[in-house]
Amino acid sequence: MALAARLWRFLPFRRGAAPGSLLSAGTSGSRGHCGPCRLRGFEVMGNPGTFKRGLLLSALSYLGFETYQVISQAAVVHATAKVEEILEQADYLCESGETEKLYQLLTQYKESEDAELLWRLARASRDVAQLSRTSEEEKKLLVYEALEYAKRALEKNESSFAAHKWYAICLSDVGDYEGIKAKIANAYIIKEHFEKAIELNPKDATSIHLMGIWCYTFAEMPWYQRRIAKMLFATPPSSTYEKALSYFHRAEQVDPNFYSKNLLLLGKTYLKLHNKKLAAFWLMKAKDYPAHTEEDKQIQTEAAQLLTSFSEKN
């Protein structure tokens, strides 16, 4: 009704007035005085019937535009609601360890423009690539596919900490297929995106953990890789075990026991720093961590082997 009331103002006459009253008002004075006024009016409006139809069409166009806006807004709301529903399903499948079902769900929306959906698809592609039953050929395809999804997520939303995190992870994975030079060349880019992810969300333990892995990797870099790094950079990437340790501890402070690998790497870093007591403490925690994924099982095995080796040497 409010819309109808607004439209009524555009019509050439109102209720209670005769259709010709707009023109007849000009005849109330002397004919010689009003004639020119009426002529000027006709020169502007043209034929009265045409003018009325024009105004009516304008009013209908206005009504059509408002209807279009309402429908468009409703479509956006519906699309947003659908994306939210997909994300809820995806997060449930991820938490349940349903790796392949999650990938199948999200690949249906691989042309999406939504950054939240795209980085989840990058993660799902990578997770399927890491399954033991995935062939080497399929794994390579999935790794590159994951990088493309992560890149698109970042392009859609540079303020998404998760997009930065998964772009860095996927870029690192691609280095496994492009050689040590490419891996080292991408090192600073990877670090930059991990640091940006932490800046955007200081409470994300995974981003902090990954920054720790970056430090650990360059702290233990073998001599021949250091030579390659010096050829690629004036100041090659480097780090220390102490820096790695600080990130692993920081991740635990943010979210205790969030990830079995963080526990394992705390133990391994303490071994590198020759602190056997604390190394044993964290390796034991890694060994006793409940195994929910294949990776958890592998970490349990590695922690147990390190503890056995550790005890035999003592």
From Swiss-Prot:
It holds the Pfam family RMD1-3. GO terms for molecular function: microtubule binding. InterPro entries: RMD1-3_a_helical_rpt, TPR-like_helical_dom_sf. Keywords: Cytoplasm, Cytoskeleton, Microtubule, Repeat, TPR repeat. GO terms for cellular component: mitochondrion; mitotic spindle pole; spindle microtubule. It is found in: Cytoplasm; Cytoplasm, Cytoskeleton, Spindle; Cytoplasm, Cytoskeleton, Spindle pole. The modification N6-succinyllysine is found at residue 165. It comes from the Eukaryota. TPR repeats lie at residues 168-204, 222-258. Belongs to the RMDN family. Interacts with microtubules. This is Regulator of microtubule dynamics protein 1. It comes from Pongo abelii.
